[in-house]
C-alpha cells in the first residue's frame, strides 16, 4: 500500500508544482501588461501554490519512510505538519491580497487591455480544473491529508479565477473598483480556506479519532464475529495513510486461550480487509472481569 500511496501522492505534488509554475509565468506577464490587482492576487496565490506543492512533495517522501528506533509509529504526522504550514502560507497571502485590495479600492487604477487578462484567466481556470480533478482522484485512492489540503487550495483557485473573470468583465465596462472589490472577496475566501485547513491539520496532530462512520464499521465487524460477546474501549487515530485501531474484545470465560487468540486474529484480519494498511491492536478480556459500568463508550 505504501508504495502505491507514495507514487500517487508524489505524482499529485509534482503535477501541482508544474502547473503552478506554468501559471505563474503566464500571470506575471498578464499582470505586467494589464496592471490588474485581481491578476496580482492570482499571481501571489500561484507563488504560494508552488511553495506549498514543493513542501508537499518533500514532506510526503519523508512521511513514507519506515518506522525506526526513534519513530516507532512511523513518520506519517509529517503530512499534518505540511498541511499546517500550508495554512500559514495561505493566510499570509490572503492578508497581502486584502491590503492590496483596500489600497486599490481607495485609489482605483484603470486596466490596460483587460482582454489579455480574460484570456489568461480562462487558461488558468481550465488548467486548475484539470489539476483539481486529478487531485480529487488521488485523494479518493489515498486519503492523503497533504494532497487534500493542496486540493482545497486549488479549489479556492477555481473560485478565484471565476471571480477574476467577472471583475475583469466589469472593469472592461468602466467599473474599475470591481477589480479591487473582488480582490478583497478573494482574500477573505482564501483566509477562510486556510483556517479550515489549519484546523484539520491541528486535529490530526492532536490524534482526533476516526470519523464516526468508520468507528461504527469497526464496531459492527467486531460485535458480529462468532466467539465475541462484546467489545469496549475502542481507540482510533490516523497518521498519514495509516489508521491506528485499538479495541478490547469480550469473550466467554470458558474459551481456551489458544481459541481466543485465533478469534482475535480473525477479527484483526477482518478489520484489515476493510481498512488496508491499518495498525490494529486487539486485547481479549474474559466477560467476568469486564464491569459494565466501567466501560468507556466506543464512540466517545
From Swiss-Prot:
The keyword Ribosomal protein does not apply. It catalyses: Zn(2+)(in) + H(+)(out) = Zn(2+)(out) + H(+)(in); Cd(2+)(in) + H(+)(out) = Cd(2+)(out) + H(+)(in); Fe(2+)(in) + H(+)(out) = Fe(2+)(out) + H(+)(in). Keywords: Cell inner membrane, Cell membrane, Ion transport, Iron, Iron transport, Membrane, Metal-binding, Transmembrane, Transmembrane helix, Transport, Zinc, Zinc transport. One of its GO terms (molecular function) is zinc efflux antiporter activity. Its main location: membrane. GO terms for cellular component: plasma membrane. This is Cation-efflux pump FieF. It comes from Shigella boydii serotype 18 (strain CDC 3083-94 / BS512). The lineage of its organism: Bacteria, Pseudomonadati, Pseudomonadota, Gammaproteobacteria, Enterobacterales.
